[in-house]
Curated annotation (Swiss-Prot):
Primary localization: cytoplasm
This protein's name: GTPase Obg
Gene symbol of the encoding locus: obg
GTP-binding found in the keyword field: yes
An example molecular function term from Gene Ontology annotations: GTPase activity
Cofactor(s) the protein requires to work: Mg(2+)
Function, in words: An essential GTPase which binds GTP, GDP and possibly (p)ppGpp with moderate affinity, with high nucleotide exchange rates and a fairly low GTP hydrolysis rate. Plays a role in control of the cell cycle, stress response, ribosome biogenesis and in those bacteria that undergo differentiation, in morphogenesis control.
Pfam hit, one: MMR_HSR1
Enzyme class: hydrolase
Subunit field text: Monomer.
């Protein structure tokens, strides 16, 4: 399925139904009182986070979404029925913002989460509402209120634990295919990956994490060059970044250290918070480096790159070194999950007190 991570839609909640002017007509009762009912409220527009969806492509082809208006009030004290609501299914991780102002409105972060993106208008009052001791036969009524109308921008940020960074052709797609259930397109030319790929890496029973592979970055990406800048937002919710470096480029004039520094510079320009995320260095394609040269080449790279973080030497093609990397990633992600879900510290002044009920 084609991955679409941005869409624009127009939503319109239903208008409220109008109130009714009506009077009782009974035999032998010349002046029956008012019995005009209120109009029904207009339908709401909801959005629900559906874990079975991973793209916004459907909203590219159906831009306008309208709920039904409420029914008008009727005589005999009959109120109008509420208009039918509509629910739009969106992938988990969708950000909903105002298309005109850019204001962030909602984030759908948990499966099944429901938000009201446009409220239906209230129904108008029938003349029954205006009866008083002074006015026994009111002929007033009010129209229904209009429903909310909004132009919205939908933006999808994938919810992955680990994000892959690197130049085009660094071997990110080969790595994600080697360690996960993802099957991205792989070829020996740059820009093979044109949209994000998600893969679930299973470490053991009930032990897994999600990896996101985005199109490769090039110099100037933060200003819009290449493809990767469009998808950098997907890395903002990850717990860990893997910086994948091609240690055996086809073009011998290409310096892996210069490429790696360019990636880090683009990351810093794009988003400081993203730049400060935990980041590990993954030196790939070492199977193409003569065995006697590997240690010296890795040492030289780390020294010139001035890297002080974790370093992993792998070959995604032969899967050499992938298993220790996967185990280390899981331990890191699992530790962060435990820290995030840890119970809040109890104030010692209230420790041991029975719950009040």
């Amino acid at each position: 399925m084609k991955f679409v991570d941005e869409a624009f839609i127009d939503v319109a909640a239903g208008d409220g139904g109008n109130g009714c002017v009506s009077f009782r007509h009974e035999k032998y009762k010349e002046f029956g009182g008012p019995n005009g009912g209120d109009g029904g409220r207009g339908g709401h527009v909801f959005a629900v986070a559906d874990p079975n969806l991973n793209t916004l492509v459907d909203f590219r082809y159906s831009r306008r979404h309208e709920a039904k208006r409420g029914e008008h009030g009727m005589g005999s004290d009959m109120f109008g029925a509420a208009g039918a609501d509509i629910t739009l299914k969106m992938p988990v991780g969708t950000i909903i913002s105002d298309a005109d102002t850019g204001e962030l409105l909602y984030e759908l972060l948990t499966p099944g989460e429901v938000v009201t993106i446009a409220k239906g208008g209230d129904g108008g009052f029938g003349n029954l509402r205006f009866k008083s001791a002074i006015n026994r036969a009111p002929r007033q009524k009010t129209p229904g209120w209009p429903g909310e109308r909004k132009s919205l921008k939908l933006e999808l940020k994938v919810l992955a634990d680990v994000g892959l960074l690197g130049m085009p052709n660094a071997g990110k797609s080969t790595f994600i295919a080697a360690v996960s259930n993802a099957r991205p397109k792989i070829a020996d030319y740059p820009f093979t990956t044109l949209h994000p790929n998600l893969g679930v890496v299973r470490v053991g029973p009930e032990q897994s994490f999600v990896v996101a592979d985005i199109p490769g970055l090039i110099e100037g990406a933060s200003e819009g060059a290449g493809l990767g800048h469009q998808f950098l937002r997907h890395l903002q919710r990850t717990r860990l970044l893997l910086h994948v470096v091609d240690m055996a480029p086809f073009d011998e004039s290409v310096d892996p250290v210069a490429q790696a520094k360019a990636i880090v510079a683009e990351l810093k320009k794009y988003d400081t918070q993203l730049y400060e995320k935990p980041r590990w260095l993954v030196l790939n394609k070492l199977d193409m480096v003569p065995a006697e040269e590997r240690a010296a080449r890795v040492k030289d790279f780390v020294k010139r790159f001035k890297w002080k973080g974790p370093v992993f030497e792998i070959s995604a093609l032969t899967r050499e070194g992938c298993e220790p990397l996967v185990q280390s990633i899981f331990q890191h992600v699992h530790a962060q999950q435990l820290a995030q879900n840890a119970p809040a510290e109890v104030d010692p002044r209230f420790a041991g007190e029975p719950p009040r009920g």
